[in-house]
Amino acid sequence: MLEIFSNFHDPKLFENSLTDVKEKPISVFYDWPCGWNQNEIENAISKNPHNILILGEPNEYFGTHDFAIQNSRLFSVILTWSDDIINRSDNAVLFPFGTTWLRDDYISKMENPTDKKFEVSFLRGAKKKAPGHDLRWDLYDDRNRVQVPTKFFDVLDDFDPNTGFHTDLYAKEIVWNESMFHIAIENHSHNGYFTEKVVDAFLTKTIPIYWGCKDIDKYFDEKGMIRFETKEEAISKINNLTEKDYHDRKEYMEKNYKLALHYANFFGRFKNFLNDLVTINKL
């Protein structure tokens, strides 16, 4: 019977999308293990003969990539965006993280936005644990140097300082509603690692001013975005923006929108992979 071990996503999110295989002898491990002892690991691995490991977060957080490389034999397949794991593990397969927390009806509404205006939006957030977090704070602290219209937030009204999390995922829609441009900064900068930070921009017909995935051009059309490496470069590029820069990128914006629909559907992509695995192996 299907087993789900997930450190971040609610296991029900997997269960709800995998009803077709709920009776199959498969265990799914998502960004696992974090803080598990050896006995707990062995017990979880032994529940089913087919074990699938999905890695979404960077190795810097919990060392899960190191664990995957050292223990790849425990898994039938490892799904990851990391070229390091793919190069060092025979059973690793490329599986970009992507994802989105935007509502389907909101994404549909934003397919043809009618109220976009010339401004740059940005949500700094409260975290300070990664290089991308530091860059967000540095840029926010220098926001007065930005000379074009902006809509900058440190945190949103739904942010709970006690837990460090936002309580209403839909509250972020205010970031995308009207802005032509959005500053999107990932937590870390790695090949293959991109998240809702940039996917949400593409889904809302917003041009991302982007720091993060080193090879993002493998997944999206780079002509539909603006990349930077440092705070100074970001401020310089932002201050040189015009409304024309948005309209000139519309062709590539449409292309990236369609690509983003694919990468946003994390659970759908995984469901398709799992169904193929079941069919090919006659599970």
Q: What is each stretch, according to the model?
A:
Residues M1-L55, N59, G63-V148, D158-L283:
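Pol beta-like nucleotidyltransferase catalytic core
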